């Protein structure tokens, strides 16, 4: 994975690198490989992730149809 450092701006390059790694799922992969996960635990985790995905899709569908109010946008304090 490559990141260009422009004008010696290392902070920006690190942010870009971190964002790329996040998109590629590298942090999740490193966490998963840090310790052995039993096959039964893996199945349970994957099943839980699938349930969360389905709930999220159902919630979004209800919001699109107008049966649920849309979530409120968080206002940042500056």
From Swiss-Prot:
Domain of life: Bacteria
Family note: Belongs to the bacterial ribosomal protein bS21 family.
Basic residues compositional bias, start-end: 53-62
Compositional bias per record (Basic and acidic residues), positions renumbered to this chain: 30-52
Organism: Rhizobium etli (strain ATCC 51251 / DSM 11541 / JCM 21823 / NBRC 15573 / CFN 42)
A molecular-function term among this protein's GO annotations: structural constituent of ribosome
Protein's GO biological process: translation
NCBIfam families: S21p
Alphabetical keyword list: Ribonucleoprotein, Ribosomal protein
Region named Disordered: 30-78
Xref: InterPro entries: Ribosomal_bS21, Ribosomal_bS21_sf
Name under which the protein is recorded: Small ribosomal subunit protein bS21A
Name of the encoding gene: rpsU1
Cited Pfam families: Ribosomal_S21 (PF01165)
GO cellular component terms attached to this protein's record: ribonucleoprotein complex; ribosome
Taxonomic lineage: Bacteria, Pseudomonadati, Pseudomonadota, Alphaproteobacteria, Hyphomicrobiales
